[in-house]
Amino acid sequence: MITLTQRLDHAHPVTASVTLPIDIRVKSRAKVELNDGREAGLMLPRGLLLRGGDLLSTDDGNEIIEVIAAPESVSVVRCADPYLLARACYHLGNRHVPLQIMPGELRYHHDHVLDDMLRQFDLDVTFAHLPFEPEAGAYTSDAHSHSHAHSH
């Protein structure tokens, strides 16, 4: 089995690829199947969030694997009004929903309850199978390092 131990920070010739959903791309240890059918193990530093296009390598550098973000069931909100989009971000963030934020568009794992909530704000919510690349704060190891205590 191939053991992938590091993420590379510059381009290298790719020897294979692996398509992974976000639930695996946030793990530092996992057994995965490369797109060519070979098995590989992730043995990466903790707190690393893999993105589509990232390159992983074995210790000896003989294998360079490109990460592909798998299409997932997502809800998609498209809106030209920055105020409405900000309201949607606020309410989803208040519920600690992992969220992908792009100009005029939001994506989150499909959830009909959240879809209905956003429709109450007159937002258009659709369902799609697309790569999901949420903001890193929802997944990195320091995501919840802030204090919830308040002093007055």
Swiss-Prot record:
GO terms for molecular function: nickel cation binding; unfolded protein binding. GO terms for biological process: protein folding; protein-containing complex assembly; urea metabolic process. Keywords: Chaperone, Cytoplasm, Nickel, Nickel insertion. Pfam families: UreE_C, UreE_N. InterPro entries: UreE, UreE_C_dom, UreE_N, UreE_N_sf. One of its GO terms (cellular component) is cytoplasm. Its main location: cytoplasm. It is found in: Cytoplasm. It comes from the Bacteria. NCBIfam families: PRK13261.1-1. Involved in urease metallocenter assembly. Binds nickel. Probably functions as a nickel donor during metallocenter assembly. Belongs to the UreE family. This is Urease accessory protein UreE. It comes from Enterobacter sp. (strain 638).
